[in-house]
Amino acid sequence: MGYEEHKQYQLDMRYLRMARIWAENSYCVRRQVGALIVKDKMIISDGYNGTPCGFENVCEDPDTGLTKPYVLHAEANAITKVAKSRSSSDGSTLYVTASPCMECSKLIIQAGIKRVVFCDDYHSKDGVELLRRAGIDIVQVAECE
């Protein structure tokens, strides 16, 4: 690995560690996911999975244990947050603790995000395949710290 590649790898690992820490803000019991959007080495947005603003912070249905249908994924929270700001996600990198699902992948494409770095696999690989088809650079880090 050359110097530039090593330097980028180190940055990727740092941002993924930060995304993991951010995931701790989630009230979801089944899975906590964190996301950061980075552009020009600056964090322009962040998100974690959880309920929309104004809703009770309970992600799972107490009777079934299943995730409530209105829970937002970390990627969607980060993308909608940057959309409300003066920043642009065009050309940015998304760091997320789990690979994006199909719905989040559509948002990633539309947001102009050009690179996605993640650790864990989501139960379906459809989202990652869609991102590849869209020409988005996908990096899975095998050993997340």
Task: Give names to the regions the model predicted.
Residues 1-145:
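Zinc-dependent deaminase catalytic domain
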